[in-house]
Structures are given as C-alpha cells and as structure tokens.
C-alpha cells in the first residue's frame, strides 16, 4: 500500500477534535499517515464549525489559502467536513472549484471511499442524514492513541432547538451510543495508558433519555468510573435543564469525577433566556449551581455567554453580569450575538448596533478577567494533584492539568508524562499556574 500524508485542521468544539482523531484512524486503513505540514500532504481536510458567522468565514478564508498549494502539487486533494460542510453541501464545490470533496456530520464512514474516488479525479459531496443509531455504529474507535487523556463520544445530535443555534440542523436529532460500546472503548483506552476521559455530546447529559434500554447519564458515569485505570472523568457539553439530581449526586460520590463543570447559561436574564428558548429561568440555573456546590464545595464552573441578543436591554445585560458575579466562573466563552440563517432568532430584529454589542462584550470580558484572577489567586500556595500531559513551552518545563481544569506548568523531567504528581502553586497567571514538585 502506498503511503500518503494527510493534514487536518480542526475548528470548533471538542466533538470536532474527537471526529478528527477518528478520521485519522480511518484514513490509516487506506495508507494515509498524519503530517503537520500542509505542503507535504497529499490530502488536506478541514473539519469545520458553523456555530458563529466568524468561524464560518474563517474556514472560507483558509480554503482560499490552501487551494493555492494545488499550483505546486496537482495531486493534492482538499476536502471539507463538519458543520459548514453539512450546512452548505454541494454549494461548497460550486463556490470553490478546486475543492475535491465535501462530507457531512453523518457521513464520516464514507470518507475513505470518497478519498479513493478523489484520487481518481472524481469530485464528491455527501451530506445526507442518517436518522437512527446506525450512524454511531459506522464510526470506528480511535486506535493506537499515545495520549494520556482522551475524548469518548457518548451521543450525537441535539433536539433543544435554542432559537439562536444552528447545531440541531447540522448535527441532527439526538442519538445515544450503546453503553456497552462506550465501556469497551473506555477499557481499551485505559489499557493503552489513558488515565482521563472526557465524555462528549452536543447535549451530553441527555444521554439515554430516549432509550429505556440504556442507562441514564448519571448511571453511565458511574460505570465509567468503575473501569480500572481511569482516574479522572470530565464531560462536555451539558445543558442546565438536564442537570438531574442523580447527576448532581455523582459529584459528591465519585472522586474520579473532576471538580470542573461546563454549564452554559448564555444569559442571566429571564426575558432573554425565554427568547433564546433555553428551557430554564435564571433562578433554576442558580439552584443547580447551589446544589452542585453543596455536594462538591470545591467545584468550579466554566460557561458560555451571548451578549447583544435581539431585544436585550441594558437592564437585561446587567442581569447577566450579576449572574456572573454570583456563579463566579473560572473561565467563560463569550460572544456578541450574530444571526445564523435558518434559526428562529434570525427572524428577530437584530436591533443592537455592532458598537453596543462590542461595548457589552468588553465589559463582560473585563469582569470575567478579574474573576478568573481572583480565583487563581486563591490557589496560590495550595497543593494540587496534576496529571502530567506534555512538555511545556519553555525548556525544562512539563505541563498538565489539575482536577479543576487549570493548566499547571512546572520544572520536571519528561519521564513524568502520564503520571500524577503533587505540586505547590507558586505563581498564578490569567490562563495558567506555575507549580513546584512536592516530595513524595
């Protein structure tokens, strides 16, 4: 079999990162090995995100740069997958004549055949939905991982249809993977040296809700925690309305379940939440936060916020700031609203100026920056157990993550990668911590 090189760029969420890892596993079966150099590749793939307009345009600009490589390599194949591919379909081939293949979010299992067809000079687009659990059986597990932590997809799709969000339209309805397949993959990862798994889904805590044959998400976490070798569990992304009492109890009962939770609020205003179609009120969200802190006092929250949603008043924006002050997120992904064609919110009057949206975003981010540093300051001098994951950016340093998700850099030998070490935090920064090894 001839060996070719494949270069993948991944945009967007952890689900896309996991999909890209699986794509590399699949392509190995037809002789492709990964490279970090686009100019070296026979095959270049972009795994794309369309959640926000900025991400979508970034993909188009990147494609325009990459097709230039075809001037020097007539054999080069360029493909686009992910949510932009699902949304645009064959229109991508029409917009970019030098593009060779387009594959949607349900069609990864067809990619090898599409690549082989492209090698023969055929241009292909496949974005048809598979509307049942067959789509989760068609995608192979990752093989040969050398990572210490790994993503594990447990469900796909979303049926919340928040008014601003394109995801249900490009990812399709919710489908839960069989728990036996999930546990088999987790055991394989543990046997390969993985010590931390992150369970993934567009709305991960709705796992099993549509199937009486599968455990609930809380029960699934308990099953994963029982796998020998797995010492840490995280999950992304959860919806506040599906944060059940049973799932909250897991944070008090399972030491392996990390003390970091991504719990997107999107707004602190009941009026805005209703227009967004989020399915909960401000107080219901805060009740979940208080319940989680009651069972896990050291828990920290990350989240998402949208400012400038249609109709948002200054008073409603202030309610978002006050929610942030009460929750005290350790990190926050924040964005100015941009309408997505095909969503319900796109039909609302986008009545805030770009300048006002930007002003609110800057005020929100300034508050978050202060809060992050205040939380980090409290960690100064504390003892933290860190899973060492990689070499650091500075010579002689290695890097890992604490239970709370903070990146910690420290001086140490690379032989520590893959182990848990105890560190004392000696310096804090906005996005990372500096530690020193404790004897033990």
Curated annotation (Swiss-Prot):
The keyword Transferase applies. GO terms for cellular component: cytosol. This is tRNA-2-methylthio-N(6)-dimethylallyladenosine synthase. Signal peptide: none annotated. The keyword GTP-binding does not apply. Residues 144-374 form the Radical SAM core domain. Keywords: 4Fe-4S, Cytoplasm, Iron, Iron-sulfur, Metal-binding, S-adenosyl-L-methionine, Transferase, tRNA processing. Its EC number is 2.8.4.3. GO terms for molecular function: 4 iron, 4 sulfur cluster binding; metal ion binding; N6-isopentenyladenosine methylthiotransferase activity. It comes from the Bacteria. Binds 2 [4Fe-4S] clusters. One cluster is coordinated with 3 cysteines and an exchangeable S-adenosyl-L-methionine. It catalyses: N(6)-dimethylallyladenosine(37) in tRNA + (sulfur carrier)-SH + AH2 + 2 S-adenosyl-L-methionine = 2-methylsulfanyl-N(6)-dimethylallyladenosine(37) in tRNA + (sulfur carrier)-H + 5'-deoxyadenosine + L-methionine + A + S-adenosyl-L-homocysteine + 2 H(+). Its cofactor is [4Fe-4S] cluster. Belongs to the methylthiotransferase family. MiaB subfamily. Disulfide bonds: none annotated. Residues 377-439 form the TRAM domain. InterPro entries: Elp3/MiaA/NifB-like_rSAM, Methylthiotransferase, Methylthiotransferase_CS, Methylthiotransferase_N, Methylthiotransferase_N_sf, MiaB_methiolase, rSAM, rSAM_horseshoe. Catalyzes the methylthiolation of N6-(dimethylallyl)adenosine (i(6)A), leading to the formation of 2-methylthio-N6-(dimethylallyl)adenosine (ms(2)i(6)A) at position 37 in tRNAs that read codons beginning with uridine. [4Fe-4S] cluster 1 binds at residues 13, 49, 83. Coiled coil: none annotated. [4Fe-4S] cluster 2 binds at residues 158, 162, 165. Residues 4-120 form the MTTase N-terminal domain. Pfam families: Radical_SAM, TRAM, UPF0004.
């Amino acid at each position: 079999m001839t060996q070719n090189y494949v270069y993948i760029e991944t945009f967007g969420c952890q689900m896309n990162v996991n999909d890209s890892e699986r794509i590399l596993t699949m392509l190995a079966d037809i002789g492709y090995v990964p490279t970090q150099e686009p100019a070296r590749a026979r095959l270049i793939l972009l795994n794309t995100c369309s959640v926000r307009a900025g991400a979508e345009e970034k993909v188009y600009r990147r494609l325009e740069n990459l097709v230039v490589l075809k001037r020097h390599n007539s054999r080069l194949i360029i493909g686009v997958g992910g949510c932009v591919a699902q949304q645009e379909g064959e229109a991508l081939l029409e917009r970019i004549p030098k593009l060779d293949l387009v594959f949607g979010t349900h069609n990864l299992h067809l990619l090898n055949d599409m690549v082989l067809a492209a090698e023969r000079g055929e241009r292909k687009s496949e974005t048809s939905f598979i509307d049942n659990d067959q789509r989760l059986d068609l995608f192979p597990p990752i093989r040969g991982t050398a990572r210490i932590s790994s993503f594990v997809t447990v469900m796909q799709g979303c049926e919340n249809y928040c008014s601003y969000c394109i995801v249900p339209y490009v990812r399709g309805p919710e489908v839960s993977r069989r728990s036996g397949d999930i546990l088999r993959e987790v055991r394989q990862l543990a046997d390969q040296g993985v010590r931390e798994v992150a369970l993934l889904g567009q709305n991960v805590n709705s796992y099993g809700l549509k199937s009486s044959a599968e455990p609930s998400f809380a029960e699934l976490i308990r099953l994963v925690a029982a796998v020998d070798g797995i010492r840490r569990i995280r999950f992304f992304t959860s919806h506040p309305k599906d944060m059940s009492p049973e799932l909250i109890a897991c944070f008090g009962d399972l030491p392996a379940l990390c003390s970091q939770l991504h719990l997107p609020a999107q707004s602190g205003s009941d009026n805005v939440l209703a227009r967004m179609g989020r399915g909960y009120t401000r107080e219901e969200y805060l009740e979940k936060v208080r319940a989680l802190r009651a069972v896990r006092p050291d828990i920290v929250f990350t989240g998402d916020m949208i400012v400038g949603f249609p109709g948002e008043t200054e008073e409603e924006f202030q309610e978002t700031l006050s929610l942030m002050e009460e929750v005290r997120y350790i990190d926050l992904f924040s964005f100015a609203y941009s309408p997505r064609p095909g969503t319900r919110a796109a039909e609302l009057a986008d009545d805030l100026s770009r300048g006002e949206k930007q002003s609110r975003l800057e005020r929100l981010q300034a508050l978050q920056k202060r809060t992050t540093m205040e939380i980090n300051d409290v960690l100064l001098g504390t003892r933290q157990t860190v899973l060492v994951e990689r070499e650091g950016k500075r010579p002689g340093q290695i890097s890992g993550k604490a239970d709370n998700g903070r990146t910690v850099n420290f001086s140490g030998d690379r032989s520590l990668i893959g182990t848990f070490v105890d560190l004392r935090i000696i310096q804090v920064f906005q996005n990372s911590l500096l530690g020193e090894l404790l004897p033990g």
